């Protein structure tokens, strides 16, 4: 498992693809948080990272779909996945190693956004007048959210040999689980299943963390999603 993990990390950082993906992630984040007038922190007027935590899940939809789309499907199309299976390592160890590598890359991106936190801290008036508990819980929720997304992304990568189909399928499911079901509820005039469906959405459980609430049921929800798609 560790060998697979190390291999995937090295492949990602040894390629121009990895540099481009990381650069695009921070470019989009930076534009929304510091530049665009409708969303930048300076016009928001409050020392808070709420804007970042509202925007970043949508950026991760594209990022995670991009890094997971090829992680299994490419090896299958090239025939190298069968070579891996011939080695003294189980199929589950291969998938687990790949999952941990993509989750690690996602967590690394999250970790590299900590300067946003430091900047907000220093911009606050008086100095340090920010709600650190909300920020910490939001980061925990984001780590769990991207873990669930990576699990689903690898599932679709193993399902399809075509990387484009894998990418589009992941994007669709991520958006459906995060935003799409809420849109369905919005147009539901009866609202009989509204609260029931909400409990199955990423946004519902992620929003618990972004409100500064560590709810064990939301933690368990994300763990169940990860395990469910891993064992698929």
Predicted regions and their residues:
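Hydrophobic alpha-helical transmembrane segments
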Residues: 1-63, 67-70, 220, 225-232
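Cytoplasmic juxtamembrane interface segments
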Residues: 2-6, 72-81, 146-169
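Short amphipathic alpha-helical coupling elements at transmembrane boundaries
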Residues: 3-11, 82-86, 198
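Hydrophobic alpha-helical membrane-insertion segments
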Residues: 16, 22-24, 102-110, 167-184
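Secretory targeting signals
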Residues: 31-34, 46-59, 101-163
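Terminal transmembrane helical anchor/hairpin motif
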Residues: 36-50, 166-232
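Transmembrane helix boundary and interhelical loop/hinge segments in multi-pass membrane proteins
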Residues: 67-87, 99
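Short coil/turn motifs that cap or connect alpha-helices
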Residues: 90-91
């Amino acid at each position: 498992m560790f060998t697979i993990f190390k291999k995937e990390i090295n492949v990602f950082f040894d390629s121009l693809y990895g540099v481009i993906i990381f650069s695009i992630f921070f470019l989009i984040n930076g534009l929304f948080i510091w530049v665009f007038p409708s969303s930048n922190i300076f016009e928001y007027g409050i020392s808070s990272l709420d804007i970042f935590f509202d925007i970043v899940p949508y950026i991760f939809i594209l990022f995670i779909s991009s890094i997971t789309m090829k992680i299994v499907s490419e090896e299958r199309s090239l025939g190298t996945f069968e070579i891996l299976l011939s080695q003294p390592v189980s199929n589950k160890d291969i998938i687990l190693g790949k999952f941990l590598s993509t989750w690690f890359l996602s967590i690394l991106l999250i970790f590299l956004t900590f300067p946003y936190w430091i900047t907000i801290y220093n911009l606050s008036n008086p100095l340090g007048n920010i709600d650190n508990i909300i920020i910490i819980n939001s980061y925990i929720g984001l780590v769990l959210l991207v873990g669930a997304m990576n699990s689903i992304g690898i599932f679709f990568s193993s399902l399809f040999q075509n990387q484009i189909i894998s990418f589009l399928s992941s994007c669709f499911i991520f958006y459906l689980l995060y935003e799409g079901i809420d849109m369905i509820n919005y147009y539901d005039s009866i609202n009989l299943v509204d609260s029931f469906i909400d409990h199955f959405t990423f946004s519902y459980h992620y929003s618990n963390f972004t409100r500064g609430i560590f709810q064990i049921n939301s933690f368990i929800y994300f763990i169940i999603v990860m395990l469910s798609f891993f064992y698929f």
